[in-house]
UniProtKB/Swiss-Prot annotation:
The keyword Ribonucleoprotein does not apply. Residues 224-411 form the Helicase C-terminal domain. DNA-dependent ATPase and 3'-5' DNA helicase that may be involved in repair of stalled replication forks. It comes from Thermoplasma acidophilum (strain ATCC 25905 / DSM 1728 / JCM 9062 / NBRC 15155 / AMRC-C165). The keyword Nucleotide-binding applies. Its EC number is 5.6.2.4. It comes from the Archaea. This is ATP-dependent DNA helicase Hel308. Belongs to the helicase family. Hel308 subfamily. PANTHER family: ATP-DEPENDENT DNA HELICASE HEL308, DNA POLYMERASE THETA, PUTATIVE (AFU_ORTHOLOGUE AFUA_1G05260)-RELATED. InterPro entries: DEAD/DEAH_box_helicase_dom (IPR011545), Hel308-like_dom4 (IPR048772), Hel308_SKI2-like (IPR050474), Helicase_ATP-bd (IPR014001), Helicase_C-like (IPR001650), Helicase_Hel308 (IPR022965), HTH_61 (IPR046931), P-loop_NTPase (IPR027417). Residues 31-197 form the Helicase ATP-binding domain.
């Protein structure tokens, strides 16, 4: 069967640039099951055409005048999917992506035909109104195997379970990598299973044991990693290498760059001084880059974009890349199969290895992909053989985590899904955790959660279970109840910035900064009168204090060793928690709300209070705002009335940018006058 034989409008073919492809068997079978009104789990390798199945399901749902929600586990994947699914606009669909604010109303979904959300965003929207799902005909769960991820998995599982509980008629399309218990996942979702090992680009896997290459049943001696990489690049291929640490990614990329000439005209630059710009610009002209979570969001996006454009030929990355965006290459090398963790050295999981190697072979460019594991000892060689010859681990639910049960129990009561302990159990019966673990363990966890929530003032029984004002606000804000208690503690003491950032830093959502400056942390605690306070929270607080004093990323890296990407991740969470603190002030201390709202904006932007107005102008971040302020333009009105020549004279402002900023400032100023 070809795409044209699906019976769709001819414009559907344009989603594939007019190419009338023959459907793969698993695509045809999945679409057949979807047309029968079945839930479907599709378990196939990377780049095996799952997107076409999603296109088809979303388009058919649109033709039935129903909406589709597409769930992904990561923001980077949401942006990638939005770029792909936006092509459906040519068929008349209204497509929207939403990945930010967790306090939004879900009403906007009614205005669109297809909405792309992260798991967390979807879950937070359902906290406000789960019955929005009654307007939804299709729920696409991408990367459903990530349910087995301890940190991200429970949220995806929760969204799927709420959907099935609230609207049993919603169709579910779950897209998965190859997993060993795909049938169990299908059974949980009451779905048909479509499973295949087919790959459009064949994959060859092997082991490089020191200088011995074992590939396709053959052995080749005297082979080095550098040699294989050079041969691949010279044959117009691209390479991904995975290593165990950031430092190793940087050092290995620098070493590999030496084997190539500086032919590529690639340079990265940021508005703000950033330690990694210089490091990358040393090797980018040679077509090599490193990629890890310490890079800023913009730096990672730049590297991914240049790799897709085939200007960057080699990326050395940590395993975070394999869990993120779809970035295939002809050759994938897993350089390290172990990593350091809190419990010492451990082996990567089979699923992680398969996710990395599965990226070998770029459709449309490569006739085949090669996935290699490099090892240097006999024991590692045996481990590598096991990786290549065995299936990935089964997907196991982590929804029974104590904090997750407490969080979801409060949410179920707040959403109106549960009015009694038995109602809560009915909800949990729709989860994978229940199907894998049964009732007894859950009853114990639910009982403990209810006691905690009632004791701490989140719920009450009268006689039905109801949320208090604190419980409702906590659930709507999408924060952990324990974190809400930490934030509430703030209102019992001095209402100043230092105390606020300390209590924000106490919250479990913020991973403490691992800095060695105990003295400054203890001094901070002494200054705020909490000498026996939490030293890890104090360390985070002093970094946040530097951030809102406009410390640059370079300064923070030089002083604390904090990479830009790590800083951005903490800022994002501190932004949300400071917003939550301002919301909670309406209950506990309304007179400090304005101060907390200002602090929220300062954390979001990394600014002192004097440039608050200027960062409200679109396109003006903290660096440009400070330059405008120092040049005497200290308000939106000042910018709106300035001449382009005056702004153009400020460092970093082009003629185009100056005119755009003036225009935007005038728009804001005119609205304020009205």
């Amino acid at each position: 069967m070809k795409i044209s034989e699906l019976g769709y409008d001819r414009a559907f073919l344009q989603l594939f640039d007019g190419n009338d492809f023959q459907l793969y068997d698993h695509q045809r079978m999945a679409i057949e099951q979807i047309r029968k009104g079945r839930n479907v789990v599709v378990s196939v390798p990377t780049a095996a055409g799952k997107t076409l199945i999603a296109y088809s399901a979303i388009y058919e749902t649109f033709q039935r005048n129903l909406k589709s929600i597409y769930i992904v586990p990561l923001r980077s994947l949401a942006m990638e999917k939005f770029s792909e699914l936006s092509r459906l606009r040519d068929l008349g669909l209204k497509v929207k992506m939403s990945i930010g604010d967790y306090d939004d109303s879900p009403d906007f979904i009614k205005r669109y035909d297809a909405v792309i959300l992260t798991s967390e965003k979807a879950d937070s929207l359902l906290h406000h109104d789960p019955y929005i799902l009654n307007d939804v005909g299709l729920l696409v769960l991408d990367e459903i195997h990530t349910i087995g991820d301890e940190s991200r998995g429970p949220t995806l599982e929760t969204v799927a379970s709420i959907a099935r509980y609230v609207n049993p008629d919603v169709r579910i399309l779950a897209l998965s990598a190859t997993v060993s218990n795909a049938m169990e996942l299908a059974s949980w979702l009451d779905a048909s299973l479509i499973k295949s090992d087919f790959r459009p680009v064949p994959l060859k896997t092997g082991i490089l044991y020191r200088d011995q290459l074992y590939l396709d049943g053959k052995r080749r001696s005297g082979v080095s990693i550098n040699q294989i990489i050079r041969e691949t690049v010279e044959d117009n291929g691209q390479v991904l290498m995975f290593v165990s640490s950031r430092k190793k990614a940087e050092d290995t990329a620098r070493d590999l760059a030496q084997i190539f000439g500086s032919d590529a005209n690639i340079k990265i630059s940021s508005d703000e001084t950033n330690v990694y710009d210089d490091m990358l610009n040393e090797i980018l002209p040679r077509g090599v880059a490193f990629h890890h979570a310490g890079l800023s969001n913009d730096q990672r996006a730049f590297i991914e974009r240049e790799f897709r454009a085939r200007r960057i030929k080699v990326i050395v990355a940590t395993p975070t890349l394999a869990a993120g965006v779809n970035l295939p290459a002809r050759l994938v090398i897993v350089r390290d199969i172990t990593r350091w963790g809190s419990d010492g050295i451990s082996y990567l999981t089979n699923m992680e290895i398969k996710q990395m190697i599965g990226r070998a072979g770029r459709p449309g460019y490569d006739q085949y992909g090669i996935g290699l594991i490099y090892v240097s000892s006999q024991s590692s060689y045996e481990a590598a053989k096991d990786y290549l010859s065995t299936d990935p681990e089964p997907v196991v639910s982590y929804l029974g985590n104590e904090a997750k049960v407490r969080f979801n129990t409060l949410a179920a009561i707040s959403m109106g899904l549960a009015r009694s302990p038995s109602d809560i159990m009915k909800f949990y019966e729709t989860t994978l955790f229940f199907s894998q673990n049964g009732k007894d363990l859950l009853e114990e966890k639910i009982s403990a959660s209810l006691k905690f929530l009632e004791k701490n003032g989140f719920i009450k029984q009268s006689p039905d279970l109801r949320t208090t004002q604190l419980g409702k606000v906590t659930s709507d804000l999408y924060i952990d109840p324990e974190s809400a208690l930490r934030l509430v503690d703030f209102f019992d003491g001095p209402a100043d910035v230092d105390h606020a950032i300390y209590y924000i830093s106490l919250c479990r959502e913020i991973v403490p900064f691992n800095i060695k400056d105990d003295y400054s942390a203890m001094e901070f605690l002494d200054d705020i009168g909490l000498i026996d306070g939490d030293i890890d929270a104090a360390k985070t607080a002093i970094v946040l204090r530097d951030w809102i004093s406009e410390a640059s990323y370079k300064y923070l890296y030089d002083k604390y060793g904090i990479a830009p990407g790590d800083m951005q991740a903490r800022i994002s969470m501190a932004d949300w928690l400071s917003y939550s603190l301002a919301k909670l002030s309406s209950i506990y201390k309304p007179e400090v709300r304005r101060m907390l709202e200002i602090l929220n904006l300062r954390i979001k932007e990394g600014i002192r209070e004097d440039i608050l107005q200027l960062v409200l102008i679109p396109g003006v971040g903290r660096v440009r705002a400070r330059r405008l302020y120092d040049a005497g333009l200290r308000s939106i009105e000042d910018v709106a009335s300035a001449s382009p020549d005056r702004i153009k004279a400020i460092y970093g402002f082009s003629d185009t940018l100056a005119n755009a900023i003036i225009r935007r400032a005038r728009t804001i100023a005119s609205k304020e006058v009205r």
